[in-house]
Amino acid sequence: MKSAMLAGVFAITAVLNHAQAATSTCPPAQSIKQTALANGGYRYEASLPDGRTWAGENPLAPASYLADATFHDARYDASTKAVTCTYKGPMNNDASFSVTLKPISGWNLIPIAYWRGTYCEDADIAKCAFTHR
């Protein structure tokens, strides 16, 4: 009887954890806003509906970096609980910037996605989706 109750508790916990998980992707380049930094370069931000913000800076970037950029890769850093997304210019030239979202609780890759460990590279942002709480 106790083992049946314990199994039931584990099943309910698994369902609740799954229900609380959200699926996210890096922000599309079109949703990222850039703001000039005082000493040159730009700050990049994309807001989420829950109030959190993807953010990053490139002190060497000209204004054209955002307009020319497409998604390149995503990586998860367990030590800082952060997901960083990198965007690059045409033909992967030096025009690049990154935005980071942290903290990310309960991060996990999506098995059908293109993640290799904590790194995902594909031109399609959706293929680098991840789950979190």
Please place each PLM-identified region on the residue numbering.
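Bacterial N-terminal signal peptides
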Residues: 7-14
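Beta-strand-rich domain onsets/edges
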Residues: 16-18
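Mitochondrial intermembrane space
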Residues: 20-133
